[in-house]
Regions:
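Conserved class I S-adenosyl-L-methionine
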Residues: 1-43, 58
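C-terminal alpha-helical "lid/dimerization" subdomain adjacent to the S-adenosyl-L-methionine
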Residues: 4-7, 151-193, 198-212
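Short glycine-centered segments of the SAM/dcSAM-binding site in methyltransferase folds
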Residues: 48, 145-147
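Class I SAM-dependent methyltransferase SAM/SAH-binding core
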Residues: 50, 56-105
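A short SAM/SAH-binding and catalytic strip from SAM-dependent methyltransferases
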Residues: 116-129
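A short glycine-rich, Lys/Arg-flanked "PGG" loop and its adjoining helix->strand segment in the class I
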Residues: 132-144
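C-terminal lobe and adjacent flexible extensions of AdoMet/dcAdoMet transferase-like proteins
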Residues: 213-225
Length: 225
C-alpha cells in the first residue's frame, strides 16, 4: 500500500497543499455540499465505511461525528495531507483509521468489505480509465446492498458554470482529466461498474463550477472482496 505511484497532490501542485482547506472552503461551498453528502447515509453502529481520497479528512471526520459507532477508514496516497488528517481527528477525539496508500485490491482485501464507500473531489483529478477502475473497485468492495456516495464536479450546465469551472478547476487540474466530468461521464461509468440504481441527488453551484452529489447502490449478491 505504500509503494510509490503517481498521484495528483491537493490543488494539483505540492506547493499549494498547505492552502488546500482554505481553497476548498472558499471555492466549493463545502459547508453546503458536505453535510448533504453525509446525510445521504447515516451509518449504523459497527458498519464499515471508507472515504476514498480522504485528503485532510474533513469528510472522514464528518462521517464519524454523524455515526460514532461506525468504523470509519480514510485512505489517501498523500502522506503530507494524511498527517493533517490524523492530527485533526486526534484533536477532536475521533477514532478513525487513516491509511496511506491507494484504494486498490490490496487495500480492499485487507480492510474491506464496506457498507458504504464515500469520495469527494477525487474523480475529476484522475484519468478516464482510472475513474472506471476506482468505481469497479468500489463496487467489488461493497457488501450486497451497500452504497456509493460521491460529491464531485459533474455536468457544467450553462455558460456561467462552464466559465467558472474552466477558469478555476481546469486551470489548476488541466483539461484532459476534468473535461470528462464536465460532460457528465460519472453516472455512465457507475452503471458500467455494476451500480444500479444511480441517482444524481443534488447539484450545487459554486464559484468553481457545479458540484453534483451521487448515490449508487450495489444490488443483489454480487461479488465482494
Amino acid at each position: 500500500m505504500t509503494a510509490r505511484r503517481d498521484f495528483t497532490p491537493a490543488l494539483g501542485l505540492r506547493v499549494l497543499t498547505p492552502f488546500y482547506d482554505q481553497a476548498i472552503a472558499a471555492f466549493t461551498r463545502e459547508g453546503t455540499w458536505r453535510p448533504r453528502l453525509v446525510r445521504q447515509l447515516a451509518p449504523s453502529a459497527g458498519v464499515r465505511v471508507v472515504d476514498v481520497g480522504c485528503g485532510t479528512g474533513t469528510l472522514t471526520r464528518a462521517l464519524k461525528r454523524a455515526a460514532p459507532g461506525a468504523k470509519v477508514i480514510g485512505v489517501d496516497p498523500d502522506g503530507q495531507v494524511l498527517g493533517k488528517a490524523r492530527a485533526r481527528a486526534r484533536a477532536e477525539g475521533l477514532e478513525i483509521r487513516f491509511v496511506e496508500g491507494f484504494f486498490d485490491e490490496a487495500f480492499v482485501a485487507t480492510r474491506g468489505p464496506f457498507a458504504a464507500v464515500f469520495s469527494s473531489l477525487v474523480f475529476h483529478q484522475v484519468p478516464l480509465a482510472e475513474k472506471g477502475t476506482i468505481l469497479r473497485m468500489a463496487f467489488a468492495a461493497l457488501v450486497p446492498g451497500g452504497q456509493l456516495h460521491v460529491a464531485d464536479y459533474g455536468v457544467q450546465a450553462g455558460g456561467l458554470m462552464r466559465f467558472l469551472f474552466r477558469n478555476t478547476v481546469q486551470r489548476i487540474d488541466g483539461i484532459e482529466d476534468t473535461e470528462h466530468n464536465a460532460r457528465g461521464v460519472l453516472p455512465q461509468l457507475m452503471r458500467e461498474a455494476g451500480f444500479d440504481p444511480v441517482q444524481e441527488t443534488d447539484s450545487i453551484p459554486t464559484p468553481s463550477g457545479a458540484i453534483t452529489l451521487f448515490r449508487a447502490e450495489k444490488r443483489g449478491s454480487g461479488e465482494t472482496i
